[in-house]
UniProtKB/Swiss-Prot annotation:
Residues 1-10, 623-633 have a biased composition (Polar residues). PROSITE patterns: CBM21. Residues 649-665 have a biased composition (Low complexity). Residues 1-20, 450-491, 616-671 are annotated as: Disordered. It holds the Pfam family CBM_21. Regulates the activity of glycogen synthase. It is most probably a regulatory subunit for protein phosphatase type 1. It comes from Saccharomyces cerevisiae (strain ATCC 204508 / S288c). This is Serine/threonine-protein phosphatase 1 regulatory subunit GAC1.
Length: 793
């Protein structure tokens, strides 16, 4: 039952609200001599409040001075509700009733907060008196009847305002509208900053936990795990507990969610599982409920829960658990949790044996991720960079910066050491050799007349001419300077590395460089040669480790055409077999015993008793092979000695001398002769035309300088050196017919290391006398085909 107490205004405090009040007062003074109080309605005794009289009197006096109505809904209720007396009853409700504290921050600037809700009790007379004294401070700006309250704060109420300020000081509260408004603006800025920080949180990462997960051990003797084995493993893992957390993972698609799986014993059908977790050592506790996930067996069920960190980030920021400063991109976050299991009116906990479960995480904000720095390779400047074109410099810069290469048009690229396996005779036209030592000055240049090119002087580091007959030692420090002329390139040849004697990228017709050594070659009137390379000079090296295995066609048969083809495949297609020129002197020191020693050393070293050092094509990228798997350079010895003798006798009758002055006419003009006389070519005569003898003073093939050496001619890339075996002792008779003014160098075979050696004793050929070699090739030699590398018949 609602009891409403009527209030009346005292005469001293009564103020007219309308202009006609003065007229009414004058009329009442004239008619009524004594003012009378309005009648007061009496209440029933059952409705009266049982309070002491002093309190009632004080209350009546207060009610007379208050423009508000105080309503008490029941005796049990102690909270006083206040509302404006001018408000309509429909607006008075529990939701719209004004409270002692402002509802929002907008009203906090103008309203006065005196007490908390717990401080205002109905039975405390002092608090109620103080409350009613300061009722005038309550805000009326939003009231519907503000027009009648404009004169509320006049001069008569200044004393009440002073009393109000003093009362605030007694309770430790001072009202200042300016400071309150300043605090409100600060709160607004703090709220906006908090929202910005919460928005900047973009990622959560779970690093580790102290949870021991449950792992099913595979069976030992069966493929599938039986129910009894699973039950035994679960019982061992639970270790007598009714609830056990066995999994904590972070979702892959949403990093802000942590999911957990809990095993509980099936003690009853109705179960309640709750997860309690905290971020600040249990000062603040958060709860999440676990739901049923699946049934493991009749004794164990599994529950699942999810912790959404995004829903808690505002609380974490307010509590300063997460701090996102400007200079930081991440913040550590630690979580502690435990499980509570309610079943059969009993509660069980899983708190990791009293230690709780810990999760160690990290929070990241937007823009805090450090970008991966792409390393830029800075190479030291070299001499080649100075002469590099801008286009090449741009290509090198782009290749060392992956970010730039992504935006450039992609094309097929190969590394510099790529082996193309190109067997085309024209491959040097499309492939630029990147070798630092073998670098031609001019590509695709053919010199038809080599007479105009003069060879460079021999190196001073070579042996002197006076030591021709002695033992020549190898000069390991003989490395010539880089090339300075366009027609001269000095290159070292390293025998241990099996470096090819070709100084270009082509193995068929290189136009970059060739060897100009002390050996002089010329052509006769009938054998035409065409020089196709510039003259260069570099020292010869050991031939004992020369690599014969890198041939393009290892399956060729032992035919005369194939053998001759492989021996000359490094020459230009128009070049014929070279012949020696000049006078040859007779060496009296050569006898039949030397020939026998030569045959014996060859029999000990080679199974086929013959070996031909040929200028064959080689793969530039496969120079390290030391195994000779090729069958093209091996020549089976002739079993018939009569054939050799016939060739010698026939060659002596048809040989004609040639001179070095006829080199200008060595260009081949007619190929028909080579085609017609191909069937008469006997390759055995070529083998018998050069003799090699054993010499004890020349252990190795060494480079030396010869003052009487003629310019190199007729060979495109390397000197053709043929090492043959004499089948009989009659071949030494050829050396006896050589003139003493012949070309001095000679080839020997050392008995110790069975290697071909170059000496200065004699290089036997037959120009002045009958020469079977020239007789055999009296006509034009056959022409090599560039495409198929076969005889062109």
């Amino acid at each position: 039952m609602v009891i409403q107490t009527a209030t009346t205004l005292s005469p001293a405090k009564a103020r007219p609200s309308f202009p006609h009040n003065d007229l009414i007062k004058s009329m009442s003074d004239s008619l009524i001599s004594r003012p009378t109080h309005p009648p007061i309605r009496k209440l029933k005794s059952s409705l009266k409040i049982s309070h002491p009289e002093p309190i009632s009197r004080s209350k009546s006096e207060i009610f007379c001075t208050s423009p508000e109505k105080n309503v008490r809904f029941a005796i049990e209720l102690t909270t006083v509700k206040r509302f404006d007396k001018n408000a309509e009853p429909s607006s008075i409700s529990n939701e719209n009733s004004p409270t002692l504290s402002p509802v929002d921050s907008n009203t906090a600037a103008d309203d006065v907060q005196l007490f908390n809700n717990e401080d205002c009790w109905f039975n405390d007379s002092s608090l109620v008196t103080n409350l009613l004294k300061n009722e005038k401070k309550f805000r009326y700006m939003n009231s519907l009847n503000n027009m009648f309250k404009l004169d509320l704060y006049d001069s008569e109420d200044e004393d009440d305002i002073d009393e109000h300020i003093n009362s605030q000081a007694e309770y430790g509260y001072t009202y200042n509208s300016l400071s309150t408004r300043g605090k409100t603006s600060e709160n607004k800025s703090a709220t906006s900053s908090l929202a910005t920080q919460a928005t900047n949180i973009c990622d959560w990462k779970l690093h580790c936990t102290d949870l021991v997960p449950f792992k099913i051990a595979p069976p030992l003797f069966t493929k599938t795990l039986s129910a009894s084995d699973l039950q035994g493993q679960l019982t061992k893992y639970l270790n007598g507990q009714n609830v056990k957390l066995h999994s904590l993972t972070q979702l892959g698609d949403d990093s802000s969610k942590i999911t957990g799986l809990v095993y509980v014993k099936n003690l009853s059908f109705e179960k309640y599982l709750e997860i309690k977790f905290t971020f600040n050592s249990w000062r603040d506790i958060h709860y999440v409920t676990a739901n049923f996930n699946r049934t493991i067996n009749s004794n164990v069920d599994e529950f699942k829960f999810t912790i959404d960190l995004n829903s808690l980030k505002y609380i974490l920021l307010i509590k300063r658990i997460i701090t996102m400063e400007k200079n930081t991109s991440s913040c550590p976050l630690n979580i502690e949790l435990c499980c509570r299991y309610d079943v059969n009116n009993e509660t069980y906990y899983d708190n990791n044996n009293g230690k709780n479960y810990h999760l160690f995480m990290t929070t990241f904000k937007k823009g805090g991720e450090t970008k991966e720095k792409i390393p830029v390779v800075v190479e030291p400047a070299s001499q080649t960079d100075a002469a590099m074109s801008p286009k090449e410099m741009k290509a090198r810069f782009v290749s060392s910066n992956p970010t730039l290469s992504r935006f450039l048009p992609q094309s097929r690229k190969f590394s510099e050491d790529t082996d193309y396996y190109n067997t085309s005779p024209l491959k040097h036209l499309y492939h630029n050799d990147t070798t630092s030592w073998v670098k031609p000055k001019r590509l695709n240049v053919v010199l038809d007349k080599l007479e105009n090119a003069t060879p460079p002087p021999p190196s001073s580091a070579l042996a002197n001419d006076t030591a021709r007959t002695g033992k020549i030692t190898k000069d390991k420090n003989n490395v010539l300077a880089p090339p300075t002329a366009s027609n001269s390139i000095d290159l070292p040849i390293l025998g241990s590395q099996h470096q090819s004697l070709y100084s270009g990228s082509s193995s068929y017709s290189s136009s970059s460089s060739s060897i100009s050594s002390s050996l002089s070659f010329a052509s006769s009137n009938n054998s035409s040669t065409n020089s196709s390379s510039a003259s260069c000079s570099f020292p010869l090296t050991e031939l004992d480790n020369f690599d014969y295995a890198n041939l393009y066609e290892p399956n060729d048969t032992f035919t005369t055409a194939n053998l001759f083809n492989h021996s000359l495949n490094s020459l230009m297609p128009e070049i014929s077999t070279p012949s020696f020129f000049g006078g040859f002197r007779n060496e009296n020191t050569i006898n039949n015993n030397d020939s026998k020693n030569l045959v014996t050393s060859l029999e000990d070293s080679y199974e086929d008793k013959q070996s031909v050092i040929t200028d064959t094509t080689m793969d530039e990228n496969n120079k390290t092979s030391t195994i000779n798997n090729s069958t093209d350079t091996l020549i089976k010895p002739s079993k018939e000695n009569g054939t050799v003798k016939e060739n010698k006798s026939s060659a002596n009758s048809t040989s004609a001398p040639s001179s070095s002055q006829n080199r200008a006419s060595t260009i081949l003009n007619d190929h028909s002769n080579g085609k017609s006389d191909l069937k008469y070519v006997n390759y055995q005569s070529l083998l018998d035309s050069h003799c090699f003898y054993n010499h004890p003073s020349s252990p190795n093939l060494q480079s030396t300088s010869f003052s009487s050496a003629a310019p190199f001619s007729g060979i495109s890339q390397a000197s053709d050196i043929f090492d043959y075996e004499n089948e009989d002792s009659d071949s030494n008779q050829i050396a006896g017919e050589i003139d003493n003014n012949s070309f001095p160098p000679h080839f020997y075979l050392d008995e110790d290391d069975k290697s071909a050696c170059l000496s200065d004793d004699a290089l036997i050929d037959h120009h002045r006398n009958t020469n079977p070699f020239i007789n055999t090739f009296s006509s034009s030699p056959p022409i090599l085909s560039q495409e198929v590398d076969r005889w062109r018949l």
